[in-house]
A protein has these predicted regions:
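Short, Lys/Arg-enriched charge-dense amphipathic segments
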Residues: 32-33, 62-69, 102-114
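Active-site phosphate/pyrophosphate-binding segments
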Residues: 76-114
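Glycine-rich phosphate-binding loops that contact phosphosugars or nucleotide phosphates
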Residues: 1-65, 71
């Protein structure tokens, strides 16, 4: 029994470089699901005057957006099946901490790092 692996990667970048892994394989070649973050080569967005290399990676913001969209769609699918997933509330809003404490109490045996 295995797990399904998902990669968020920059396909333009990976197409322009050789693998540094001893297997000579790249991430997208060993994962079941591959999501292209559509970044530029070298994952950089700006070339400032006097610089030899570009700076300002886009993969961080795009990757976070992709992951958050996956979470949103997953919650939508669960709700459509009548399942209300335990989602933490922002602790910075009134009542947020109390709301989260209920979840902590309910799932305390499964949340070992808290």
């Amino acid at each position: 029994m295995g797990v399904t692996t998902v990669a968020i990667t920059n396909m333009e970048y990976t197409s322009g470089v050789t693998s540094r892994h001893k297997s000579r394989k790249k991430l997208h070649e060993v994962c079941d699901i591959v999501i292209d973050n559509c970044g530029d080569f070298e994952d950089s967005s700006m070339l400032l005057p006097g610089m030899k290399q570009k700076i300002g990676p886009t993969s961080s913001a795009v990757g976070c957006t992709i992951v958050n969209m996956i979470v949103i769609r997953t919650v939508e699918h669960l709700m459509e099946k009548g399942i209300e997933p335990p989602i933490f509330h922002s602790a910075n809003v009134d009542g947020g901490e109390e709301f989260n404490n209920v979840l902590f109490e309910k799932y305390k045996d499964q949340i070992h790092y808290m």
